[in-house]
């Protein structure tokens, strides 16, 4: 199964996630949903976000040109919100998984779906 298949089947296909990406800690995009227009700068910032959690709480994070307020950030998960949409970024051993939910989707289900994939990645040491 390819990285794109994982994005499309496990995240987008769940109906709980609007847009998603899997990145390396350096911001290299391993795969993303076709509708996720993440810039290189945004990918690098997301990939490195877990190295400066306190600063992130004060400055927020940009995705697709929109600034999101960071509501919570710990060593495993970052939660952001902007209007009726938001994101969850989960850290695994070798990657970060970004999931965005848009208006009409349940934030809790987006988090649960993304967290389950992150748990699976950790279980296989990825």
Curated annotation (Swiss-Prot):
Instruction: Tell me the organism.
Output: Caenorhabditis elegans
- Determine the domain of life of the protein's source: Eukaryota
InterPro entries assigned:
PFN, PFN_euk, PFN_sf
Family of this protein: Belongs to the profilin family.
Gene Ontology CC terms, in alphabetical order? cell cortex; cytoskeleton; striated muscle dense body
Q: Which SMART domains match?
A: PROF
Instruction: Enumerate the subcellular locations listed in this protein's record, separating them with semicolons.
Output: Cytoplasm, Cytoskeleton
Kindly list the biological process annotations in GO that this record carries: muscle thin filament assembly
Q: What is this protein identified as?
A: Profilin-3
**Gene name, Swiss-Prot/TrEMBL:** pfn-3
What role is this protein assigned? Answer: Binds to actin and affects the structure of the cytoskeleton. At high concentrations, profilin prevents the polymerization of actin, whereas it enhances it at low concentrations. By binding to PIP2, it inhibits the formation of IP3 and DG. Also binds to poly(L-proline) and phosphatidylinositol 4,5-bisphosphate micelles.
Return the Gene3D superfamilies for the record. Dynein light chain 2a, cytoplasmic (3.30.450.30)
Q: Where does it mainly reside? A: cytoplasm
Q: Name one GO molecular function term.
A: actin monomer binding
